[in-house]
Amino acid sequence: MDMRDIQQEIFTIDELKSLLFPVFQGYDIRRAVLFGSYSKGVATPKSDVDLLVDSGLKGLKFVGLVDDIKRSLNGKDVDVIDVSHVNSGSMVEREINDSGVEIYAK
């Protein structure tokens, strides 16, 4: 499979759960929520994977988490945001509350 095929792969929510479980455990993530097109069931081959994590990680440790998530998803584009960066009442918070799917919890 070449890189273009990998980027166009669409994962199911169950696949995302099983692929990301060891990453979330390894980084001691408290909770992870899938949102965006994947949580709504409308992902296309070009969709990235949007994740909200409750990690407490900062700086290079957070970058390492994002890299490991991307690697676990065969290089698929990901957008990872920590709960500490979500502003109350923001569009992101509303989207997560409206259509987010919890895929990991401690």
Q: Where are the language model's segments positioned?
A:
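Catalytic core of pol beta-like nucleotidyltransferases
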Residues: M1-R31, K40-P45, G56-K106
